[in-house]
A protein has these predicted regions:
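Amphipathic, Lys/Arg-enriched alpha-helical "gate/interface" segment within cytosolic domains
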Residues: 1-165
Length: 165
């Protein structure tokens, strides 16, 4: 497919990129809203269905380095939708999840969500390159081919997300 955008308001967006499936990258910009979070989780369910259909595993990378802390109701929604995704089998089809985060507040939110969801295999990293490198290694260990054309050193955020930051 390619890049899909979830826009909540003028100040938040999520770029959802499956160009290199089974490696998927979501770039969060601003404070997520209910609308953008629901669109993101709908996309994750689609990626899970695709992985099941293709009998493969996927690497889920979330670039939260441009994100702002979500409101409490949005954090609750993220927790609820994460549970729904786990119940749909994400823990069996996602090799690993990597979150690029440098904001201590965002890291705290993610850590709290991790405590609520013990089955989540989430690794926090400093850069997208690091997440992509680790993800490709994980695919290799799972004996799954790396997506053609994905070079972690050359990967860039979508232009619209770069402009918004």
């Amino acid at each position: 497919m390619a890049i899909r955008w979830a826009d909540g308001t003028d100040s938040d967006m999520i770029a959802m990129d499956d160009t290199y499936f089974p490696v998927i990258v979501a770039t969060w910009v601003g404070a997520p809203t209910e609308k953008s979070v629901r669109a993101y989780f709908q996309w994750l369910h689609e990626m899970l269905a695709r992985a099941k259909r293709d009998s493969t595993l996927f690497i889920n990378i979330t670039d939260a380095s441009l994100a702002k802390t979500p409101a409490p109701d949005v954090r609750r929604l993220i927790a609820e939708l994460t549970t729904t995704l786990e119940n749909a089998g994400a823990d069996k089809n996602a090799v690993s999840a990597y979150v690029v985060v440098d904001n201590p507040l965002i890291r705290g939110v993610l850590t709290a969500l991790g405590w609520l969801h013990g089955s989540m295999n989430v690794t926090h990293v400093a850069t997208c390159k690091e997440a992509l490198d680790l993800g490709l290694r994980q695919l290799g260990r799972a004996r799954k081919p790396a997506p053609q054309g994905l070079d972690p050193a050359k990967w860039r955020r979508p232009e619209r997300a770069r402009r918004a930051s």
